[in-house]
């Protein structure tokens, strides 16, 4: 119970920091009691985000700070303008899943534990992280196929991320069950949102699902010359490690570059 309260307290204080409590206050019946309650838990001296920051951006910033489960929750909520409104949904649609990377040495430790082999017997030129998100991060490396050297990207789950997610989801279940006792929160269907978030994250915590989906997509599009799916190197895939062919390209959100090319 104490751990759940501390979890709730953390959420309140982060929401206060980004002025999100004001948005909640607008939509509840007992505004004065809510204001007193949140003031006691999160004093006015807490830092706040700029008041002219769009609501969706403030919500996204808070979710990023709260952790991986909240980031995934925000990405799901952003697809429901019927619940949060079009303007907030549009602002949250670009919610970035970016976090500081964990060290190369930690990544090597995870790989060696997964394959029970030394890193040098698996990969050549295993580099520093080039992209990091809430669930996993990516390193460039090379593998050897006979005399051929193949550039690859290696995706690795964050250390302890499975335990972290399970703990966060347990506490989110507790919180949503508590909030749905209040009529103001019933229409948000929080329990169904949390259930869907849990399903999405479950697949992301086992990289073999992603590898299988990529392999199936490659098979289904093999006759389409305008579409290319990188190869999955299955001998270098485990629950926590995914190895995929490295290719050059333009990110889908770089519209100007795509038009130029």
Where do the model's predicted regions map?
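An acidic- and aromatic-residue-enriched active-site/binding cleft used to recognize and process polar
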Residues: 157-161, 237
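ATP-dependent phospho-/nucleotidyl transfer catalytic cores
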Residues: 86, 92-100, 112-113, 166-167, ...
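Conserved ATP-binding/catalytic core of the eukaryotic-like protein kinase fold
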Residues: 150, 160-165
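N-terminal accessory/targeting segments that precede structured cores
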Residues: 1-137, 143, 163-194, 198
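Glycine-rich ATP phosphate-binding loop
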Residues: 140, 150-157
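Residue-level signature of catalytic and energy-coupling elements of molecular machines
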Residues: 74, 138, 154, 210, ...
């Amino acid at each position: 119970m104490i751990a759940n309260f501390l979890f709730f307290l953390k959420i309140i204080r982060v929401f206060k920091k980004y002025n999100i409590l004001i948005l909640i206050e607008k939509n509840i019946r007992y505004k004065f009691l809510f204001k007193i309650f949140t003031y006691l838990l999160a004093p006015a001296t807490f830092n706040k985000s700029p008041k002219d920051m769009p609501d969706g951006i403030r919500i996204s910033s808070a979710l990023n700070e709260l952790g991986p489960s909240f980031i995934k929750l925000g990405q799901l909520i952003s697809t429901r303008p019927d619940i949060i409104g079009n303007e907030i949904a549009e602002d949250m649609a670009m919610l970035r899943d970016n976090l500081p990377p964990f060290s190369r040495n930690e990544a090597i430790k995870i790989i060696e534990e997964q394959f029970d082999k030394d890193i040098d017997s698996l990969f050549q030129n295993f580099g520093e992280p080039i992209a990091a998100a809430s669930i996993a991060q990516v390193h460039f490396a090379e593998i050897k196929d006979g005399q051929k050297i193949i550039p690859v990207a290696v995706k690795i789950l964050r250390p302890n991320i499975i335990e972290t997610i399970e703990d966060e989801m347990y506490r989110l279940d507790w919180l949503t069950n508590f909030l749905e006792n209040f009529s103001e929160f019933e229409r948000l269907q929080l329990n169904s949102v949390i259930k869907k978030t849990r399903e999405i994250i479950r697949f992301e915590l086992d990289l073999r699902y992603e590898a299988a989906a990529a392999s199936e997509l490659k098979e289904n599009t093999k006759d389409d010359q305008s579409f290319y799916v990188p190869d999955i190197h299955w001998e270098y895939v485990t629950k926590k490690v995914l190895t995929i062919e490295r290719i050059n390209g333009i990110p889908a959100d770089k519209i100007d570059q795509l038009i130029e090319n």
